[in-house]
């Protein structure tokens, strides 16, 4: 039964503090994930890591979540978002510490594995927390704003060679300890959210039904076709964005485009800098128009264009980065709030868990494949052409993401034509 939010909603100050706490949770989490890319060239030069090993550091982050995030989503439904947020941020902190301690590849990989086990379930729990407290007319805007603040962590990770130049000058390890500091901030934000949610939960703005007694795999068959098209879009899109931008882009810009570490990381950071400001705008557009499928397609089409420009036009790294940044601002702001439309409240954690599980399968495979392509093609500063197979690989995945959104738009228009409901478009995508 829904609670009367007019009488029961906590004060604005309490809600704002809770929102800020969740923002710090995700800011630190995003910084930790993106902390590998700025030191990728140093790992290659100082520790003699291959590109396959560098790719593995982010791939192994995704590996456990192929199997665990659906379970994590169910745990969020059963044990509440607040408990899972605190537990997973603590695990991420431990993983960040182990990564910083690891001068050997197996130790560093173990740290990234621990970080990954906690991180993606944390994302599911945070999304559910936002839905529980802020679902309503401006949910897409609030979700997008939270995502923007999280991406500020990624932007700071890319800019860290500039504002923490002294740490990078001392080798690969001090920047990893900086990532630990951000993990501590994430854990502090989780504690703030935990305390406030425990105190205010009975008066929340969205009273979800009790969680199911047990997970039934038949729930997978209950989700609508539109949901699975969203999953396909998610997998293809993120299999491009994070393996390229968060693993190989800075190294590619250094070796293939001749940029310094500072210049390459600054250019790469513009992808997330654009998202910090533009994502809430696109979230507001979604709230105001409800044209989910059209907005998804508009955001997705820019992704293959960005790689087409990068491959075919010399000196086009800036233009490609612009297209990538707009796409990354646009599509996620629409994609994740749209999941709520097709998921029963009692299965919301499971729905996000399924999507995140398959997303991580794509991230794992794409990181490994991209690193393998670079190694087998001899990609390096003396052979910049060796990066071409990786770029074409990401370009084809980008095209697949766009085709999924086009199919969603076609499917939705067909459903609307068949229903021909005179009372309005209600819950349909447009």
Residue locations for each model-derived region?
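Juxtamembrane intracellular "pre-TM" segments in multi-pass secondary transporters
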Residues: 3-12, 197-231, 425-430
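Extracytoplasmic gate region of multi-pass secondary transporters
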Residues: 36-37, 225-272, 276-279, 366-367
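Conserved MFS/SLC helix-loop-helix module at the cytosolic interface between two early adjacent transmembrane helices
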Residues: 67-106
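Helix-loop-helix hairpin linking two adjacent transmembrane segments in secondary transporters
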Residues: 145-198
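Helix-breaking motifs and short loop linkers at transmembrane-helix boundaries and internal kinks
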Residues: 48, 80, 101-107, 118, ...
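Cytoplasmic helix-loop-helix junction between adjacent transmembrane helices
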Residues: 105, 111-150
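C-terminal transmembrane helical hairpin of 12-TM major facilitator-type secondary transporters
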Residues: 292-338
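Helix-to-loop junctions at the C-terminal end of transmembrane segments
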Residues: 68-80, 278-291, 374
